[in-house]
Amino acid sequence: MIGQVALDVPRPAEDRGWNGSLVIMSGAAGRIVTALELTRLSMAFGAIADLWLIVMLARADPRYAFMPVYALPLPVSLACAAIAAIGLFAFGASLNDLLDARHDRAFAPQRPLPAGRIRGGQALVVALASLLASLAASVIFGTGGLILAVIVAGLLLLYNAAAKHVPAAGLVTIGVASAATMMIPNDQFTFTLPAWLTMTHATAIATLVYVLDGKRPQITARAGVLAGIGWIFWSMLLIGAGVARSPETGYWPAGSAWWAPVLPVVATALFGIVVVRKVRRAKSPSIAAEKVARYGALWQALYAAMWLFACGLHMAGIALGAFAGVGFLAMTVLKEILGSSGRPLEWRG
C-alpha cells in the first residue's frame, strides 16, 4: 500500500529491539541497512502485491488485449510492476524523512537522518532515484501508467508537505494514492472493487495509526465527517467509473463465481480480528500503532491472493499467498536487524 509509506510511526523506546547491529555494521552492509531503514522497503510487499494483482487479472481478460500489460511477457510485466511499486514506496518514505528531519531529531532520533547515518543530500538522491525508477517502469505500461505514477508522486508530495497536518485531507489522500498506484499496470481496468478495498484499507489504517500514535492535530468530529465525505466521494467515483466503462461485458471478471466477494470479506474480517488482538495486547498505544501499520501493509498481499482465488486464478492466488508469507518473514527479520519499524503511507498513503 503505497499511501502507507507516508505514515511515520516511531518505534517506541521500550520495543526497539537490539540496536547494536547498526553500530557494528560498516561499509556496504551498513549502507544497505541504512537504505532499507530510510525507504522502509521491508513493508513494500503489500504494494508490490497490489500491482501484481492487476497484472494477473488484466492478462487473464482478453478485453485488455490492446493494453501493453497483456502483450508484454509475464516476467517483464511483473518486474516493471514491482519496480514501480518499490520506487514510489521508497520515494514517499525518503521524502517523509527529508521533510520531517527536524521533527525526527526530537521524537525519532534513531531514524537514519537524525542519527547521522545518512546525509540529507544522500537521502534526496535516494528519493529522486526511486522516483525516476518508478516512472521508467510505469511508462512500460503506456501513457496511462506514466500519468498515474506522476499523479501518485504528486499526492505523496502533497501529503508530506501539507496534507498530513490536516487530517480531513491527509487520511483520504493516503487511500487515493494507494488506489491510484494499484492501477498503474492497467489504467483502463474496469473491475475497480480491489482498488476500492485498497483505498478503504489504507484510509482506515492511516486513521487508526493516527489516533493510536496520538498525532496532532487531533481528529475532531468535523475533520472526521469531512474525511468520511471524501472517502464516499472517491468510492463513488472509483466504482462508478468502473461500472460505467463496462456496461456490456459486465463489471465482474469472466469466470468469477457468485460467491467471489466472500473471500475478500473474510480476509477483511480476519484483519479486524488481528488488529483488535494486537491493540489489546500492546504495551502502549505507540506500540499498537506500529503493529497496526506493519500488519496493515502486509495484509494487502493477502487481499490480492483472495481476489485471485475469487476470480478463478488459483495458481496465481497460491503464489501471492506464498509471497505474503515471505513478506511477513522479511518484515520480522528486518524489524530485528534495524531495531525500528519502517512505515509508509502507510502506496502504504
Tell me what each language-model feature is.
Residues 2, 7, 12, 17-36, ...:
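C-terminal membrane-associated helical module and adjoining short loops/tails
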Residues 80-85, 101-156, 160, 172-175, ...:
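Multi-pass membrane catalytic core of lipid/isoprenoid biosynthesis enzymes
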Residues 50, 88, 92, 134, ...:
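Alpha-helical transmembrane segments of multipass membrane proteins
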